[in-house]
Amino acid sequence: MQVSDFHFDLPDELIARYPQPERTASRLLQMDGNTGELIDGTFTDVLNQVQAGDLVVFNNTRVIPARMFGRKESGGKLEVLVERMLDEKSILAHVRCSKSPKPGTTIIVGENDEYSAEMVARHDALFELKFNSDKTVLDILEEIGHMPLPPYIDRPDEDADKERYQTVYNQKPGAVAAPTAGLHFDDVLLDKIKAKGAEFAYVTLHVGAGTFQPVKVDNINDHHMHAEYVEVPQEVVDAINATKARGGRIIAVGTTSVRSLESAAQDALKKGTELVPFFGDTEIFIYPGYEYQLVDCLITNFHLPESTLIMLVSAFAGYENTMNAYKHAVENKYRFFSYGDSMFIKKKTI
């Protein structure tokens, strides 16, 4: 398939630049992957979709304030966007400036030149930086970093984003973009879902800035995914096995949860084993033709045209169903992308 097969026209006014006042106030487009049937509703309708015995899988990554502003020692302005933390003192980052810094040079970050870092090495488009401070990278980011809002939100970050560009169940710092399907859940809704008899499990995928990179090839088979770190621990494996044994469904909250679970499944297939814990980088690229191993239902926001994420959804719900749902969403003025509305999708099985 061609990347252009996943194009759709999106009016600029449908890009959500701010979240709704309440997390659960977003709209929910419900789709049956087998019939293509669409039902308009609100996000609290998730409660009607979840059944006793289901397992709802969340990504518990925490977004770090990964954007820093600063300068070179020579005075030129620069912007640093963390891709991932390498250890307590070092990061791998995108550096935007007029002329790329060379290994051995020092950069200064913070509004008042609070911290310095040495450019240790360059790895393709990314720079390895080591901070000259007794503080950890996380502490420095919490002090001077900005929330890394996606480029399409097209505004500076605000204090409210520190709370709203973060799930209520986040636990493990490391993401530079939010697992956005999870932004719609508040504690009240989570309690109601549990009260219905559903169980929860938590994977970790630290979303990287590469998630916003456009697909630069014409044929999707030629695309290579960026690497992201994943954890699928033993308790998640046990919960999945127990759910399947009792006839329950695996409901993935967000494409990052899907990619975590399916990475573990593919790892087991390669090894010829039962499902086992998975810790490490994944470059899994899911597009039409992929056979899902674990996930039965998907909660996900509306994604960018020609993105790998709309390809993932198309593999789950069927290409024609997906493009028709997006056409319906545009016509009915759903809000798109990170702060936008959501979908609940039952997997296409026929």
Swiss-Prot record:
EC number(s) per entry: 2.4.99.17
Reactions mediated catalytically: 7-aminomethyl-7-carbaguanosine(34) in tRNA + S-adenosyl-L-methionine = epoxyqueuosine(34) in tRNA + adenine + L-methionine + 2 H(+)
Example GO BP: queuosine biosynthetic process
Keyword Ubl conjugation: no
Membrane-spanning segments: none
One of the record's GO molecular function terms: S-adenosylmethionine:tRNA ribosyltransferase-isomerase activity
Metabolic or biological pathway: tRNA modification; tRNA-queuosine biosynthesis
Record keywords, A-Z: Cytoplasm, Queuosine biosynthesis, S-adenosyl-L-methionine, Transferase
Coiled coil residues, start to end: none
Keyword set includes Transferase: yes
Compartments reported by the entry: Cytoplasm
One GO CC annotation: cytoplasm
UniProt similarity note: Belongs to the QueA family.
HAMAP family membership: QueA
Functional summary from the UniProt entry: Transfers and isomerizes the ribose moiety from AdoMet to the 7-aminomethyl group of 7-deazaguanine (preQ1-tRNA) to give epoxyqueuosine (oQ-tRNA).
SUBUNIT field: Monomer.
Name assigned to this protein: S-adenosylmethionine:tRNA ribosyltransferase-isomerase
